[in-house]
């Protein structure tokens, strides 16, 4: 008799390959279920989820490792009110000793400098030429200034980037004494490290959610922006001191130096007032201690440089004057570049946490200080626009885009905080007028248009001749060295803002001047997805439901949806998206609601020819995959600590977002294994032999009962 091995049966093998209901003969409707149930066409929510996942992956690739680590996500999730402890920021600084936070910007800047090669001698001569042009507009007439050398180049790109990136200085010995020169080099090296620490602090201080306000982040932003205004006051004093020294060298006679702006305030007074009356010094908050220490370190290096400029002995002759001018421009370029980082980072995304957002008084004061400094010192110091800076930096803009997209996917609509900022930007944008730019104003040096050409062609040719009547102006550069479109002067409407992602885009309206000292060229406000018909102040409770439920209640998923405001040909509808409602807004809202409801529920003309009617017993076209899951992050808190706020996160299992710590909730520890029941042991007869034990008491009771019965019988 042959013994059959288990598992070798043909029936068992068939069951592994064929559904059980087909084997039993019940195959009614199985093909339809397999076809329509197995259809893998992505749902709209799945597509949005995949797009947000791609944004998150792109953002994570551009960030330092500490910003996306699990430990930082867990520590931020345990905080309330979207706050960031300063200890976490300090940990971020310690984790980035090689300045990985700015690697993309440094790479783009190095590539731009490589396309416009200038030797140290050429750059020094070009800086000196720009300085003579500046000095003629500052000092009264009667001062003999050397003539411009023929065929010199435009040093704007190198002045903007080289002092910050190049380790070697152009003017290594600007002082006669060797000890003073060594002190100058050491102070500049320490200043660079101190400026990097402040930039790192700003980079790592961002909370986890940009759609909600953050109190401590707003305080830190106020401190940083107030610190920018202090930097420009110090820079004005440094340039004033250099001008005074150069004028004395050019005219040794007792000619009185009368600058147009007057004598600026001494740096010691400016620094002391900021440390005593600055935003972080007057609030008494303990969440800015490391920031105040970093600011004090920078101000200490600036004080040492100011003392060297005021008391250091310079070399005589032409070389002494050249070294004085070049060293001043180098140091001020480092500080100016650092101030641009803070301002442009605020405009790129950090402004969502600022007090009053873009109407922040410290932001306005910082931009005004930069504008005044660039106007006074033109054409020495160029200024980079915020879109150009964001295209070079990459990581900050990518992070804000991914974070806001994830919040928009979870909630289905922008938060009230985020939407208020968009309304503010849109309301200011409606006051701007557009006009065709003159052809000569839209061209940069060498006749090239501001949006095209290469950096090498733009900066390697001869410098453009400036008219003697208006004062010279400093160019504004894009990341490749292209001059940016100028800003409208005060009192005139500014042009509409182009898209920051389009390097060839030119605004339709330029200023009435050929070039300006400063350009504030922001981005077009991002378009909002379609909201509920009711306004943001009358938002229905259904807005908190999952997106599938809300969209199913509003109509079929295959209805066309309008994303963003109306096209530009309908300005009234576009303005109504963001502007404040007028007196007749209630009546208009009711009429719009009724019209949109009729249009939404009305059948389309071609519905019958396109779609088939699915009967009730036919089954669904595709199987809905549950996409919304709710995670509650329960953190262990002490008895005195406030409970951590739970957060909700959407997840589609079909389109995995990956193991990113900023998307996935922190893993919960596995529950302890269940304890096995202990065996019931025999009960120990405790106190059985003692006088009051249970055994002796029972025996005594029985003995007394027996004696009573025997006594009765004996009677």
Curated annotation (Swiss-Prot):
PTM summary: Phosphorylated by host LCK. The phosphorylation seems to be lymphocyte-specific.
Quaternary data: Interacts with VP16. Interacts with host LCK, PIK3R1, SHC1 AND GRB2; these interactions promote the activation of the PI3K/AKT pathway. Interacts with host YWHAB. Interacts with ICP0; this interaction targets UL46 for degradation by the proteasome.
Entry keywords, A to Z: Activator, Host cell membrane, Host membrane, Membrane, Phosphoprotein, Transcription, Transcription regulation, Virion, Virion tegument
Residue ranges with Low complexity bias: 456-467, 475-488
Name recorded for this polypeptide: Tegument protein UL46
Comp. bias (Gly residues): 444-455
GO biological process: regulation of DNA-templated transcription
Pfam entry (one): Herpes_UL46
Topology term for the membrane: Peripheral membrane protein
Chief place where the protein resides: virion
Record-stated family: Belongs to the herpesviridae HHV-1 VP11/12 protein family.
InterPro entries, per the entry: Herpes_UL46
Annotated compartments: Virion tegument; Host cell membrane
Biased composition (Pro residues): 664-677
Region: Disordered, residue numbers: 432-513, 585-605, 659-680
Domain of life where this protein originates: Viruses
Task performed by this protein: Plays a role in the activation of the host PI3K/AKT pathway to promote cell survival. Interacts with and activates host LCK and thereby recruits downstream partners SHC1, GRB2 and PI3KR1 in order to activate the PI3K pathway by phosphorylating host AKT on its activating residues. This mechanism is inhibited by the viral protein US3 that instead promotes incorporation of UL46 into virions.
CC terms in the record's Gene Ontology section: host cell plasma membrane; membrane; viral tegument
């Amino acid at each position: 008799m042959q013994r059959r091995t288990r598992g070798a049966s043909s029936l068992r093998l068939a069951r592994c390959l064929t559904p059980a209901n087909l084997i039993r003969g019940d195959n009614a409707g199985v093909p339809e279920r397999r076809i329509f149930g197995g259809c893998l066409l992505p749902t709209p929510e799945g597509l949005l989820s995949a797009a947000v996942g791609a944004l998150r992956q792109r953002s994570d690739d551009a960030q330092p490792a500490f910003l996306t680590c699990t430990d930082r996500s867990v520590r931020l999730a345990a905080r309330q009110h979207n706050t960031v402890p300063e200890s976490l920021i300090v940990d971020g600084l310690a984790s980035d000793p090689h300045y990985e936070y700015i690697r993309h910007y440094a790479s783009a800047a190095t590539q731009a400098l490589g396309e416009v090669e200038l030797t140290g001698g050429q750059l020094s001569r070009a800086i000196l030429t720009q300085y003579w042009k500046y000095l003629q507009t500052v000092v009264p007439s009667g001062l003999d200034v050397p003539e411009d050398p023929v065929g010199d180049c435009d040093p704007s790109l190198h002045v903007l980037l080289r002092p910050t990136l190049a380790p070697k200085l152009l003017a290594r010995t600007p002082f006669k004494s060797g000890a003073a020169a060594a002190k100058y080099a050491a102070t500049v090296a320490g200043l660079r490290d101190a400026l990097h620490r402040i930039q790192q602090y700003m980079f790592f201080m961002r909370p986890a959610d940009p759609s909600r306000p953050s109190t401590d982040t707003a305080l830190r932003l106020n401190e940083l922006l107030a610190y920018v205004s202090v930097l420009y006051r110090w820079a004005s004093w440094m340039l004033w001191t250099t001008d005074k020294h150069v004028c004395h060298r050019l005219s040794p006679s007792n000619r009185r130096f009368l600058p147009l702006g007057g004598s600026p305030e001494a740096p010691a007074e400016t620094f002391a007032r900021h440390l005593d009356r600055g935003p972080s010094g007057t609030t008494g908050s303990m969440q800015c201690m490391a920031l105040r220490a970093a600011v004090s370190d920078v101000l200490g290096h600036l004080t040492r440089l100011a003392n060297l400029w005021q008391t250091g002995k310079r070399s005589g002759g032409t070389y002494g004057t050249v070294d004085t001018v070049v060293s001043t421009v180098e140091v001020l370029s480092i500080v100016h570049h650092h101030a641009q980082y803070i301002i442009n980072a605020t405009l790129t995304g950090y402004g969502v946490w600022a007090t009053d957002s873009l109407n922040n008084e410290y932001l306005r004061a910082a931009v005004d200080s930069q504008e005044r400094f660039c106007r006074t010192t033109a054409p020495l110091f160029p200024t980079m626009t915020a879109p150009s800076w964001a295209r070079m930096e990459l990581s900050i803009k990518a992070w804000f885009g991914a974070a806001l997209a994830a919040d928009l996917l979870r909630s289905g609509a922008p938060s009230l905080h985020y939407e208020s900022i968009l309304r503010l930007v849109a309301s200011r944008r409606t006051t701007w007028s557009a006009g065709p730019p003159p052809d000569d104003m839209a061209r940069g040096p060498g006749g090239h248009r501001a949006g095209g050409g290469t950096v090498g062609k733009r900066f390697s040719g001869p410098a453009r001749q400036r008219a003697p009547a208006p004062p010279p102006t400093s160019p504004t550069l894009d990341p490749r060295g292209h001059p940016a479109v100028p800003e409208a002067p005060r009192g005139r409407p500014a042009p509409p803002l182009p898209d920051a992602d389009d390097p060839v885009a030119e605004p339709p309206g330029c200023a009435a001047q050929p070039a300006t000292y400063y350009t504030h060229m922001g981005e077009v406000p991002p378009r909002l997805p379609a909201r509920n018909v009711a306004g943001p102040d009358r938002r229905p409770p259904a807005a908190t439901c999952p997106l599938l439920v809300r969209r199913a209640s509003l109509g079929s998923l295959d209805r066309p949806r309008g994303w963003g405001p109306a096209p530009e040909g309908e300005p009234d509808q576009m303005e109504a998206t963001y502007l404040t409602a007028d007196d007749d807004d209630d009546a208009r809202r009711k009429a719009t609601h009724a019209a949109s409801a009729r249009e939404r529920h009305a059948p389309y003309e071609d519905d019958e020819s396109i779609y088939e009617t699915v009967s009730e017993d036919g089954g669904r076209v595709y199987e809905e995959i549950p996409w919304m899951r709710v995670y509650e992050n329960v953190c262990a808190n002490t008895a005195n600590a406030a409970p951590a706020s739970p957060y909700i996160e959407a997840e589609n299992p079909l389109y995995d977002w990956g193991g990113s710590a900023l998307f996935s909730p922190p893993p919960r520890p596995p529950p302890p294994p269940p304890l096995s029941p202990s065996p019931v042991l025999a009960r120990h007869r405790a106190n059985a032999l003692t006088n009051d034990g249970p055994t002796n008491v029972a025996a005594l009771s029985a003995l007394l009962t027996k004696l009573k019965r025997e006594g009765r019988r004996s009677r």
